[in-house]
């Protein structure tokens, strides 16, 4: 017998399917989102099936390369370089991180629809080798758990680790995201992926993603702006709107594993997470660790982020934490956060 959630969700899936087949061509043409325009100059130095390696470096030295790992989730890596004054990339460069790279995940296609978490690990490993280990990893949101697991899987390839708004122990505190996932049955997830031809389509995931109903307030909160009065503020608003409209499609197996392994089963925090043939023990991550959480973050609440401190093998004196007075998106694109927290991270990375 269907539970109440299934009874609600099956009609939703069916309606979505009918709507897509009836209106998809015209809708896609009319609503095609603006392509990503980077705020900071960069060049692509490696093009893999699942990601691009972008080099933002201002010099030739590779003494302390920093690799920012964007989330492979609903939206693209534009959140790391949204607009002047709203860019972790810009802040890191301006404060001494001159050898700076970004893992920019591609939207999944028919060719990559079977990718798994292992596939993402393998791609990230190739990127680190391309840069030249050891690297400093800066994991943003979903890129955070991947970075922590990578540092535990390949400890000799990492020097320092920064996690920003990263869900590490997903049972440490309730979140809007876990609240969305918990009622969804495995059958519904499989059906969503089947209807996407093996992909979890971003436009479908967006319908389930928790977000405030007041879009204007959400935008201003994410950017940490008052009502815009300057051209720079208006540009930031426009860039946010374009970023918000660009959705990434996810490989079905990868999406399924993230939902089950990270959220429902909390495998990373409980030592039951496997990557590339080995069980991941967070205690193998003995490098200095910086944790940044948002005080009002309902996607990765502070307790989920700061739980990493008790899981890793780093010395207590090598762990630094910071709590920013903001929500989730403002950690990556907020003006105040870019002015205060990211320079602090850059200084810490130079240690």
What role is predicted for each listed range?
Residues 309-329:
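Catalytic histidine neighborhood in serine/cysteine hydrolases
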Residues 1-52, 85, 107, 136, ...:
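Amphipathic, low-complexity, repeat-rich surface-exposed segments
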Residues 138-147:
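Gly/Ala-rich beta-loop-alpha elbow adjacent to hydrolase catalytic centers
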Residues 298-304:
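Conserved alpha/beta-hydrolase "acid-adjacent" motif
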Residues 285, 291-293, 297:
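Short beta-strand/loop motif that positions the catalytic acidic residue
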Residues 1-17, 132-133, 146-253:
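Alpha/beta-hydrolase-fold enzymes
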Residues 31-32, 38-109:
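Short, surface-exposed "cap/lid" segments of acyl-processing enzymes
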Residues 325-340:
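Catalytic histidine-centered segment of alpha/beta-hydrolase-like enzymes
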């Amino acid at each position: 017998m269907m539970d109440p959630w299934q009874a609600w969700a099956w009609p939703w899936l069916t309606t979505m399917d009918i709507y897509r087949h009836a209106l998809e061509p015209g809708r896609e043409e009319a609503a095609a989102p603006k392509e990503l325009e980077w705020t900071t100059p960069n060049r692509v130095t490696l093009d893999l099936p699942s990601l691009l390696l972008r080099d933002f470096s201002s010099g030739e030295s590779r003494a302390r390369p920093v690799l920012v790992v964007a989330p492979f989730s609903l939206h693209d890596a534009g959140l790391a370089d949204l607009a002047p004054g709203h860019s972790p990339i810009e802040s890191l460069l301006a404060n001494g991180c001159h050898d700076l790279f970004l893992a920019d995940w591609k939207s999944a296609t028919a060719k990559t629809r079977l990718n798994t978490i292992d596939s993402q690990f393998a791609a990230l490993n190739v990127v680190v080798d391309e840069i030249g280990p050891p690297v400093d990893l800066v994991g943003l949101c979903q890129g955070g758990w991947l970075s922590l697991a990578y540092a535990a899987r390949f400890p000799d390839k990492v020097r320092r680790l920064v996690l920003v708004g990263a869900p590490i122990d997903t049972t440490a505190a309730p979140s809007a995201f876990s609240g969305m996932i918990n009622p969804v049955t495995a059958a519904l997830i499989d059906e969503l992926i089947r209807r996407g031809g093996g992909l979890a389509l971003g436009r479908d995931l967006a319908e389930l993603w928790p977000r405030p109903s007041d879009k204007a307030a959400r935008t201003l909160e994410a950017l940490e702006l008052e009502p815009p009065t300057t051209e720079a503020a208006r540009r930031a608003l426009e860039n946010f709107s374009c970023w918000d409209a660009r959705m990434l499609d996810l490989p079905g197996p990868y999406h399924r594993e993230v939902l089950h392994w990270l959220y429902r089963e909390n495998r990373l925090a409980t030592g039951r997470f496997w990557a590339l043939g080995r069980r991941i023990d967070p205690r193998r991550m003995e490098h200095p660790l910086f944790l940044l959480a948002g005080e009002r973050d309902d996607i990765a609440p502070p307790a989920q982020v700061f739980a990493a401190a008790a899981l890793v093998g780093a010395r207590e004196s090598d762990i630094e934490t910071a709590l920013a007075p903001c929500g989730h998106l403002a950690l990556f694109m907020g003006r105040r956060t870019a002015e205060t927290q990211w320079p602090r991270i850059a200084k810490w990375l130079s240690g």
